[in-house]
Regions:
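Hydrophobic face of amphipathic alpha-helices
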Residues: 246, 250, 254, 258, ...
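Long, hydrophobic, amphipathic alpha-helical segments used as structural scaffolds
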Residues: 189-196, 261, 265, 293, ...
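N-terminal interaction modules that seed assembly of large macromolecular complexes
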Residues: 268-324
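Glycine-rich, aromatic-bearing surface loops/beta-hairpins
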Residues: 371-409
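Long, charge-patterned amphipathic interaction tracts in eukaryotic proteins
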Residues: 304-375
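Alpha/propeptide regions of enzymes that mature by internal proteolysis
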Residues: 2-264
Length: 409
């Protein structure tokens, strides 16, 4: 696409379009406009950008960075059964520009939702566009769980970022900064160690734009008519900055904006989310408890008591912390993150699983629970059999403690 290289003519104003309320925010270089259909940044003095947007040449000279909501795109499509392609997105974007009297070239992206936050740091502005299908629901007492009305097979969590730099940087430097920002964003989310079912739906449709100013001399119309917009021979500010220090500031800006975006959607993780990720359900643990009853027949009343006791025990902050530590230890050992321990070699005198399981059983029901824990640990009925070595004994201790408690009542 050469959408942003040519200077555009003023588009026609369509007076028959229903007026939509828009939010406008001034930026250091440009203006952000957002309504229910789109979010776009307009800079009549032009951006030089490098991006991975759907409608983009990679390197572009444009006046508008546009993000259209999927709802708007869906409403204006002729055939929703076919996948959206770049040509159709371009046509819909052109129509939107015409309806809203938007001038100039553009790069564009479709996005499910277009909530946003702005983080500004002198010469660096980060606009994070947020699309989120997750919510935190109350489950029991203080226990909460992340869920989605779409179900996790269809849910999305995406954070698109537009990083605007109040400098005139060369395409080469923009590409370098794009790589820096992309890598830092990936490192940040990886460092969160989110549960697998959440991590799987995270940032599958995200995007990144790095935008800078054009050198001032290129804004002169006589200069453009005589020289043209030759981005290879412009006078850039690359040598005027401390690159190492600027890269550190970009990295910090990306991390802080991601942290603030997570805070905006209130996405935080608790023990039940880790249980979901491991495929451990309360009902499965109840079945384990019932399977090892001696001289007592399972009953609905007993199952209900065990379920309540399990939830009560998981709500205990001490047990909660032990369970999460076991989940994280299992993951770290599987992925070889602990240099001194290789579980593939079956190290001798290594039994943190038994220590954690025994501690949990004892915390719930005292020393009496340890006998049940040893039996559960040895026989590993039901879901315990399929868990990893750390989690198997950890949850054996949880179930043993809860069973001991309800049978003592």
């Amino acid at each position: 696409m050469k959408r942003g290289i040519q200077l555009s003519k003023k588009s026609k104003n369509n007076k028959n379009i229903k007026e939509i309320e828009s939010i406008k925010k001034s930026l250091v270089n440009g203006e952000l406009i957002k309504n229910e259909d789109a979010l776009y940044i307009n800079n009549p003095d032009y951006f030089l950008t490098f991006s991975d947007l759907e409608i983009s040449d990679g390197i572009d000279i444009i006046e508008n960075i546009m993000v259209l909501s999927d709802n708007y795109i869906s409403f204006n499509r002729e055939n929703e059964d076919e996948p959206l392609n770049d040509v159709e997105l371009m046509e819909i974007t052109e129509e939107y520009k015409e309806k809203n009297d938007i001038e100039g070239g553009y790069i564009a992206q479709s996005f499910d939702k277009i909530d946003y936050i702005i983080n500004a740091y002198d010469d660096i502005t980060v606009i994070t566009v947020i699309s989120n299908d997750l919510e935190i629901q109350d489950f029991y007492d203080d226990l909460k769980v992340v869920n989605s009305w779409k179900g996790f097979n269809n849910a999305k969590v995406d954070f698109g970022q537009i990083i605007i730099l109040n400098h005139a940087f060369s395409p080469k430097l923009l590409i370098q900064l794009y790589k820096v920002a992309t890598k830092q964003k990936a490192k940040f989310f990886e460092s969160l160690h989110l549960p697998l079912h959440i991590n799987t739906i995270l940032n599958n449709d995200d995007f990144l734009v790095i935008a800078s100013n054009l050198p001032e001399e290129t804004l002169d119309q006589d200069y453009i008519m005589e020289i043209g917009l030759d981005i290879t021979n412009m006078e850039y500010e690359d040598d005027d900055i401390d690159l190492e220090e600027f890269i550190e500031r970009i990295e910090d800006a990306v991390v802080i904006s991601c942290e603030d975006a997570l805070e905006k959607i209130n996405l935080n993780i608790g023990i039940l989310d880790y249980l979901v990720s491991e495929g451990i359900q309360i009902g499965d643990m109840v079945e384990v408890g019932m399977s090892l009853l001696e001289n007592i027949e399972p009953s609905d009343e007993l199952k209900e008591k065990l379920e309540k006791q399990l939830l009560k025990s998981i709500s205990d902050r001490n047990i909660n912390a032990l369970l999460i530590s076991a989940v994280r230890l299992e993951e770290d050992l599987k992925k070889g993150r602990v240099r001194e321990i290789d579980i593939n070699e079956k190290p001798i005198h290594f039994y943190p699983d038994e220590l954690v399981g025994a501690a949990i059983a004892n915390q719930i029901a005292g020393t009496k629970a340890l006998l049940n824990f040893r039996r559960y640990s040895k026989e590993k009925p039901g879901i315990l059999y399929g868990l990893g070595p750390i989690l198997s004994n950890t949850f054996a201790g949880l179930i043993a403690g809860c069973m001991t408690n309800i049978l003592e009542e």
